[in-house]
Structures are given as C-alpha cells and as structure tokens.
Swiss-Prot record:
Lineage top rank: taxon: Eukaryota
Any coiled-coil regions, as ranges: none
Induction: By auxin.
Ranges of Basic residues composition bias in the record: 229-238
Family to which this protein belongs: Belongs to the Aux/IAA family.
Region named Disordered: 33-69, 82-114, 217-238
Record organism: Oryza sativa subsp. japonica
Motif (EAR-like (transcriptional repression)): 24-28
UniProt function note: Aux/IAA proteins are short-lived transcriptional factors that function as repressors of early auxin response genes at low auxin concentrations.
GO cellular component: nucleus
Compositional bias annotation for Low complexity: 33-44, 59-69, 85-94
Gene: IAA2
Keyword Transcription regulation: yes
Protein name: Auxin-responsive protein IAA2
C-alpha cells in the first residue's frame, strides 16, 4: 500500500509539473528560464562590446589613410608664378581678335601710301651738285612751284657764280625758271622725261617722281617752243 501511495504521488507531481509548463503567460519565453535568460544577456552584452571594438578599429583606419594621403597643392608654388599664370590667362582671354584685312582696304592703303610718298619729290638743277626736296602738295599750281624752285636754287647759283658779277646780277634781277633761262622738267611714273605744265596740276602731282631744272640753251628748239606754250597755259590756269 505504501508503494502504491508513493507511486501515486509521483504521478501527481509529474502531472502538476506538466500543467505548470502549459500555463499561458505574456512575457518572453526566455524570461522564465534562468539558463536561457543568462545566455542571451551574455550575448547581448558581448554584441555591443564587439560592435564598439569594430567601430573603434574602423574609425582609426580612415584617420591613418587620411594621414598617408598626399597633400593637395604640395610642393607650394611661388606667388609670382601664380600671378604670372593668372595674368597670362586673363590677357589671353581679353585679347581682341586681330583686325581682318580685306583686299579693298589693302589696295586703298597702298594707294594712299603711294600718293603720300609722291608728294615729296627730289629736284636737281644743272650746275648745282646738291639736290633738294619739295612738297608738291604745298603748292596750288605751276606758278607757285616755279617761284619755290627759284627761291631754292637762287642762293646756290649766286654763291657759285660770285666771281662773275654780271651773271650773278642777272640771276638776281630776273626769274630763272619762269623767265626762260631755265626749264623745269619732271620724270613720270614710267620714267619718261616730260615738260612741266603739259598736264593738269592734280595729274602732275600724282605722276611726278622727280624734278629737274635744265638750262634752256641745252634743250632742242621744239622743246623750247613746247616749254613756252606750257608756261603760257600755266599762267592762264593760275
């Protein structure tokens, strides 16, 4: 009987233990188990520690990489080199484009340059070793040019013929070019020798390259006649 009672208690204790395991609760299953609750707590504490260690190692690595990286802008460039580079770049950006040369402008410039060059011409006189230069644009006609030539060479002729008083007095009394003693000729752009006064004044200025004062006695008679006619036309034009 005693054995049956003991056996019956064991069955009751086992049934009570099974019923207590089947009880419902609102907590986590690990809360009711000491062994299971201790393990997750250890894992949970170990996990943050591992995370902190990993974060610490990872945080230390970028600082080392940044220290090992080369510094930008090293070696330093001197200030005057920087200023020189900046000024050259700004001047290249602000430089105006070169002017376009058109053929019409070039032809016009060449013509103007030729006209300006033709304004000053050399003039020589027979018996005078030194030449002069005259500005044809400064005179308004053939009469003014003849008077200017007389003024240029009268003193030189007087100095050369100082020994002959009669010739010097004649040269001082009369007009050399206009009086018939000397004749004014010129060389045109083709190299031909022409008498002054045969063409209009503007054409003469454009084509005359060199002037020469020749003695009328050295010229042939037809030339003298043409010279006299040209002087008359020049006097009429003036």
């Amino acid at each position: 009987m005693a054995w049956r009672r003991g056996f019956g208690r064991e069955e009751e204790d086992a049934a009570a233990a099974g019923e207590s395991g089947l009880e419902l609760c609102l907590g986590l299953p690990a809360y009711f188990s000491s062994s299971s609750s201790s393990k997750p707590s250890e894992g949970s504490t170990a996990a943050p520690a591992f995370a902190l260690r990993s974060n610490g190692t990872n945080a230390s690595k970028p600082s080392g990489a940044a220290a090992a990286a080369p510094v930008v802008g090293w070696p330093p460039v001197r200030s005057f080199r920087r200023n020189l580079a900046s000024s050259s770049s700004s001047s290249s950006k602000q430089a105006p484009p070169p002017p376009s040369s058109s053929p019409q402008n070039g032809d016009k410039a060449s013509k103007d340059g030729g006209a300006e060059k033709g304004m000053f011409v050399k003039i020589n006189m027979d018996g005078v070793p030194i030449g002069r230069k005259v500005d044809l644009a400064a005179y308004g006609g053939y009469a003014q040019l003849s008077a200017a030539v007389d003024k240029l060479f009268r003193g030189l002729l007087a100095a050369q013929s100082a020994a002959a008083d009669g010739e010097a007095d004649a040269a001082a009394a009369g007009e050399m070019v206009g009086g018939g003693e000397y004749t004014l000729v010129y060389e045109d752009d083709e190299g031909d020798r022409m008498l002054v006064g045969d063409v209009p004044w503007q054409m003469f200025i454009a084509t005359a390259k060199r002037l020469r004062v020749l003695k009328s006695s050295d010229l042939p008679p037809p030339s003298l006649m043409r010279a006299a006619g040209s002087r008359k036309r020049a006097a009429a034009d003036s």
